[in-house]
Design a protein with these regions (language model features):
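Short, surface-exposed ligand- or partner-binding patches at beta-edge/loop junctions that are enriched
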Residues: 89
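Rhodanese-like catalytic fold shared by cysteine-dependent sulfurtransferases
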Residues: 2-10, 17-37, 52-85, 94-129
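Short hydrophobic beta-strand that contains or immediately precedes a catalytic carboxylate
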Residues: 44-49
Length: 129
């Protein structure tokens, strides 16, 4: 019974997160909400920091596309799937908001880690080196 309630709760959470999202909109979420979202294998994980930052450490299973790269949008289009939500982050939340705006304008469903990778690390969440 608890598992059914948990599954129903997760489904409700996802549907409320994406149902009202329009082109150009994205959601900024807390570390805990981001962690819950990326547990879903359908969610694409995107690190928009520099290659050097990504190489130091990152959230497991994240791909890296530097938002400061002039061809960010083109690389994203050739790498990401528009039919699957994108959960993205940067170091502190500034660059990820820029990336989220770009991708959501292109029609992607975007969730952004509001306080970035720094908050993720501070919360003791899993990272890869």
């Amino acid at each position: 019974m608890k598992i059914n309630s948990l599954i129903a709760g997760i489904c409700l959470f996802f549907s409320s997160l994406f149902s009202c999202q329009q082109k150009g909109d994205f959601k900024s979420v807390s570390v805990e909400d981001f962690s819950t979202l990326i547990a879903n294998p359908e969610i694409q994980r995107l690190d928009v920091r520099t290659v050097a930052e990504y190489s130091e450490s990152h959230i497991p299973k994240s791909i890296n596309i530097n938002v400061l790269d002039k061809t960010f949008a083109e690389i994203a289009d050739s790498t990401l799937q528009k039919d699957k939500p994108v959960a993205l982050y940067c170091r502190s939340g500034k660059r990820s908001k820029k990336a989220a705006a770009i991708l959501s304008e292109k029609g992607y469903k975007v969730i952004e880690l509001g306080k970035g990778f720094n908050a993720w690390q501070a919360a003791g969440k899993e990272i890869e080196h």
